[in-house]
Amino acid sequence: MSLDKKTVADRYAKALFELVDADNELDQTYQELIALRQVFEDNEGLDAALAGVQLSLDEKKSLIKDLQQGASKYVANLIQMVFDYGRIDCMVAIIDEFERRYDRKMKRMHADVTTAIQLDKQQEDQLKANLAKRFGANEVTLTKHVDPEILGGVIVHVDNKTLDGSLSSKIKQIRRLLVR
């Protein structure tokens, strides 16, 4: 039975996270993994090339050695193990899951924010502070979107939660109440 990508990513990320956390190498490993993810994102098709049949085994091993260059033993071992077990196509998913675990431990959160107009620095800082307080986070990173259709206010997506404080949704609520 073949495991899906999410299950594979969860297992590898959990094992690596627990290992480096116990060895006090969490921050260093996190930084290395973010850099490794960037390599995969900058070289679209790298995972497919390493998993596919276009390259010889020697060519693949050479690429793996290049990826391991300068990496800690933890990251180098992860790369080797994922390659050896034919799961290199899961590498970015593994790193994403590791980052989720890291963020949870460090009380960091990522929020998708939609506003009708561009937020200025003060508004952005205030929103970050409010979200940090509401969700108990030490650090908040915003991904900002501007959508004039919401008319005003803000829509925030965090994890699987949506906080809709937009003017357009308020108008829709009032309209529904009046139609009754």
From Swiss-Prot:
Subcellular location(s) of the protein: Cell membrane
| Annotated Gene Ontology cellular component terms | plasma membrane; proton-transporting ATP synthase complex
The residues forming the signal peptide are none
Task: List the membrane topology term(s).
Answer: Peripheral membrane protein
Query: Where does the protein principally reside?
Result: membrane
Q: Name one Pfam family in it.
A: OSCP
Q: Which UniProt keywords apply?
A: ATP synthesis, Cell membrane, CF(1), Hydrogen ion transport, Ion transport, Membrane, Transport
Q: Does the keyword Disulfide bond apply?
A: no
User: Which GO molecular function terms does the record list?
Assistant: proton-transporting ATP synthase activity, rotational mechanism
Q: Which domain of life is it from?
A: Bacteria
Asked if the Swiss-Prot or TrEMBL record annotates the protein with the keyword Protein transport, the reply is no
Q: What does this protein do?
A: F(1)F(0) ATP synthase produces ATP from ADP in the presence of a proton or sodium gradient. F-type ATPases consist of two structural domains, F(1) containing the extramembraneous catalytic core and F(0) containing the membrane proton channel, linked together by a central stalk and a peripheral stalk. During catalysis, ATP synthesis in the catalytic domain of F(1) is coupled via a rotary mechanism of the central stalk subunits to proton translocation.
Q: How does it assemble?
A: F-type ATPases have 2 components, F(1) - the catalytic core - and F(0) - the membrane proton channel. F(1) has five subunits: alpha(3), beta(3), gamma(1), delta(1), epsilon(1). F(0) has three main subunits: a(1), b(2) and c(10-14). The alpha and beta chains form an alternating ring which encloses part of the gamma chain. F(1) is attached to F(0) by a central stalk formed by the gamma and epsilon chains, while a peripheral stalk is formed by the delta and b chains.
Q: Member of which family?
A: Belongs to the ATPase delta chain family.
Q: What is this protein called?
A: ATP synthase subunit delta
Q: What gene name is listed for this protein?
A: atpH
